[in-house]
């Protein structure tokens, strides 16, 4: 199984890339994380948020791995604990399907994509910069894996 993070946005600051890379390099070979950046749509010319999200949805769908479990990150999603994520990882591994975590653009994710998701997940109740979400998600995936392995990284 492979973990994918599909994120609308590109040209992130160096500290975002460094933080993200720090956690992805710690992941074991059987749970590699691959980032797929989706170029955001411009909101110029009076385009509505709905048309921007629909265009971004098409780009996301084109980048989704075939047959992957979709975990869409959304402010109205379920509030999982790290332990719940740690419990999901082995179940997902047994299932054998790749898992694609989807981070939307500035306007969020298109409702059609959210409806199609296997899991709608909230990473925080606070509003976060999209680049920061990549780092937090990578860290939480590493922490969840470390819990499943009784690795000392997670000490709670």
From Swiss-Prot:
<keyword id="KW-0949">S-adenosyl-L-methionine</keyword>
<keyword id="KW-0963">Cytoplasm</keyword>
<dbReference type="GO" id="GO:0070038">
    <property type="term" value="F:rRNA (pseudouridine-N3-)-methyltransferase activity"/>
</dbReference>
<feature type="binding site">
    <location>
        <position position="73"/>
    </location>
    <ligand>
        <name>S-adenosyl-L-methionine</name>
    </ligand>
</feature>
<keyword id="KW-0808">Transferase</keyword>
<keyword id="KW-0698">rRNA processing</keyword>
<comment type="similarity">
    <text>Belongs to the RNA methyltransferase RlmH family.</text>
</comment>
<comment type="function">
    <text>Specifically methylates the pseudouridine at position 1915 (m3Psi1915) in 23S rRNA.</text>
</comment>
<comment type="subunit">
    <text>Homodimer.</text>
</comment>
<dbReference type="GO" id="GO:0005737">
    <property type="term" value="C:cytoplasm"/>
</dbReference>
<keyword id="KW-0489">Methyltransferase</keyword>
<feature type="binding site">
    <location>
        <begin position="123"/>
        <end position="128"/>
    </location>
    <ligand>
        <name>S-adenosyl-L-methionine</name>
    </ligand>
</feature>
<dbReference type="InterPro" id="IPR029028">
    <property type="entry name" value="Alpha/beta_knot_MTases"/>
</dbReference>
<dbReference type="InterPro" id="IPR003742">
    <property type="entry name" value="RlmH-like"/>
</dbReference>
<feature type="binding site">
    <location>
        <position position="104"/>
    </location>
    <ligand>
        <name>S-adenosyl-L-methionine</name>
    </ligand>
</feature>
<protein>
    <recommendedName>
        <fullName>Ribosomal RNA large subunit methyltransferase H</fullName>
        <ecNumber>2.1.1.177</ecNumber>
    </recommendedName>
</protein>
<dbReference type="InterPro" id="IPR029026">
    <property type="entry name" value="tRNA_m1G_MTases_N"/>
</dbReference>
<dbReference type="Pfam" id="PF02590">
    <property type="entry name" value="SPOUT_MTase"/>
</dbReference>
